[in-house]
Amino acid sequence: ITLTPNYILQLHKILFGHSAKSIGGKFKNVQNYINATDADGKYYTLFTPLAPDETSMAMNVICKQYTLALGQEAVDPLILIPVFIHDFLCIHPFSDGNGRMSRLLTTLLLYKSGYMVGKYISLESKKKKNKDLYYDALAAAQIGWHDGKENVVPFIKYLLSTIIATYRNFEERLELVSEKMSALVMVRKAVQTKIGKFTKAEICELCP
């Protein structure tokens, strides 16, 4: 995988391949906004991304910067990946599908750097479970981004904690499978590992 704007456009086209929308594989042509929902369920603007006419060049820049930094091996990929994803989200290059694309790119870049846990445990489910933490980290890291004065550390910490949690879940799953127990016992064991509320999907992840 060579990370380029064209590669990202191809992924986006595949993502929207079965959609009635004709936006797949195309950068945005109208201004978009990153919105969030408050405690009362009301939408508000969290961040205003780059304008459409700046998008293509910005995507080219961040792809080149990531590839160059990765090749120099001075910074660990686990730091470079969150920085790239943060820039991607600030640019918000597509009219729709930016969140899904960011998680797909996160998984693919982790694969390329040897972190394969996304094949077995969904990073998407982690984001959904901790949506407030995601938006808080993103909002904090986006302050000053347009002026090059952002502090991306909150987003790096968020993504690293998500990756760590995913590996812990994977380890729990391996422990359950390695014991070769019955399906019923496996489910009981999985439930015992959970504290507080949990969903059926979370238990299914632990019981392949």
Feature-to-residue mapping (PLM):
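FIC/Doc superfamily catalytic core
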Residues: 1-208
